[in-house]
Amino acid sequence: MTLHIHNTMTRTKEVFEPLDPGHVRLYVCGPTVYDRAHIGNARPVIVFDLLARLLRRLYPQVTYVRNITDVDDKINARASASGRTIGEITEETTRLFHEDMAELGALPPDVEPRATAHIADMVAMIERLIAKGHAYEAEGHVLFSVPSMGAYGSLSGRSMDDMIAGARVEVAPYKRDPADFVLWKPSDASLPGWDSPWGRGRPGWHIECSAMSSRYLGPSFDIHGGGLDLIFPHHENEIAQSVCCNGPGTFARYWMHNGYLMVEGEKMSKSLGNFVTVRDLLDQAPGEAMRLAMLGTHYRQPFDWTAEGLEQARRGLDRLYSALRRVAGIAASPAEVPEGVMAALCDDLNTPKALAEVYDLLGVLNRATTTEEQAKAKGALLAAGALLGLFQADPEVWLCGAGTGEEEGLAARVEDLICQRKAARQARDFARADAIRDELTQAGIVLEDGPNGTTWRKA
């Protein structure tokens, strides 16, 4: 099946044609590890996790690289304010990021380079840019000369005047042009730094991704992804550095960007009091519900995070897991991902359409009457879920929360009450049976009576 993706560079949806059909290479900008991941950080992780899963279905080998930015002024400021070391902050934040993303069903990338482990690559790249006349040293800094690249601004579509006026550009006296940006900056004794031909210092943000993508994917690769907010200046500057260093026609062939995130219709910010971390939400709802909620909106569209949307996603998963629990004793027939789901995802990751196909598959499973039909429908549904990163858990665990000692105790109490209710109904003591149902409802337990008996789930 042919994959079509929207290329930010050309502003059109194109047929994806990899440089090497035997090996697709993908780079995505990762987190700056100074604080807990918020839901805005989670969206690109989920989007490009799905893209990597899809690419692996279509091509024999995929290398997915997502970096960790562990040298940055925000990290320095957090260390200074907290009294902790930079290493303590970055190690802890990276670990927590991994834990949070795993709960969202995101698979780890194939390579996750840290900026601090690739300073030598950055220094070498800066040296080449200086040698080619695209960068210059000034007062301990090294800056990229934006006017030296005639095609600068091609990704964002901005003119030089627009970029200077719209960007928060530090117009320092040592800059030859106001748009020039930092590749290397000096560090005093209080800041992290590495020896370089220009003295002790640290890299600028943009050179980090250029160096790491080239290190692991080569000077030219297939797809570069990230959030819409990174188009300018970060991705624009990555292109400038990489193309001027490695030559015309190099760097990423396709650019993919996910849309902005809102919270209850407003921009997320600490000043508005609606800053939500992934952990905040994981304390309230399963990560799988968060994943489904995000997949319900096309990745290029703005996503409005709402409590109602999260609840709808949870209810949708309840329906899916309830159906899977009803056929728990039937082995799923081996199945490929259904064509409708694949076609939707190959159409620029059209997840709303793919999920509509999933709910159609759910209907097929619910209508199946023979064991053969149920096995086939179950296999198709699970295959679709495996690609989407959904409903791969034990239905009993999802619906009833089995696992911990406390949850097992709850399950035992519920099962006992279900037995009492069954006995009351057999004795035609319907008042007692209804009272038990009401008691369970008040405890957040939903009963579902079926031809094979009564099952239950948490509301």
UniProtKB/Swiss-Prot annotation:
Binding annotation for ATP: K270
Subcellular location, record wording: Cytoplasm
Gene3D superfamilies for this protein: Cysteine-tRNA ligase, C-terminal anti-codon recognition domain (1.20.120.1910), HUPs (3.40.50.620)
GO biological process: cysteinyl-tRNA aminoacylation
InterPro entries tied to this protein: Cys-tRNA-ligase (IPR015803), Cys-tRNA-synt_Ia_DALR (IPR015273), Cys-tRNA/MSH_ligase (IPR024909), CysS_C (IPR056411), Rossmann-like_a/b/a_fold (IPR014729), tRNA-synt_1_cat_dom (IPR032678), tRNAsynth_Ia_anticodon-bd (IPR009080)
Assigned EC number: 6.1.1.16
Residues the record lists as binding Zn(2+): C29, C209, H234, E238
Sequence motif 'HIGH' region, residues: 31-41
Chain ranges for the short sequence motif 'KMSKS' region as given in the UniProt record: 267-271
Record note on cofactor: Binds 1 zinc ion per subunit.
A Pfam entry, by short name: DALR_2
Keyword GTP-binding carried by entry: no
Domain of life: Bacteria
GO cellular component, one term: cytosol
Keyword Nucleotide-binding belongs to the record: yes
Cofactors required: Zn(2+)
Catalytic EC class: ligase
SUPFAM superfamilies tied to this protein: Anticodon-binding domain of a subclass of class I aminoacyl-tRNA synthetases, Nucleotidylyl transferase
Keywords of the record: Aminoacyl-tRNA synthetase, ATP-binding, Cytoplasm, Ligase, Metal-binding, Nucleotide-binding, Protein biosynthesis, Zinc
Gene Ontology molecular function: any one: cysteine-tRNA ligase activity
Catalysed reactions, as listed in the record: tRNA(Cys) + L-cysteine + ATP = L-cysteinyl-tRNA(Cys) + AMP + diphosphate
Alphabetical list of PANTHER family matching this protein: CYSTEINE--TRNA LIGASE, CYTOPLASMIC (PTHR10890:SF3), CYSTEINYL-TRNA SYNTHETASE (PTHR10890)
HAMAP family linked to this entry: Cys_tRNA_synth
Subunit structure: Monomer.
Family per similarity comment: Belongs to the class-I aminoacyl-tRNA synthetase family.
Protein name, as recorded: Cysteine--tRNA ligase
Name of the encoding gene: cysS
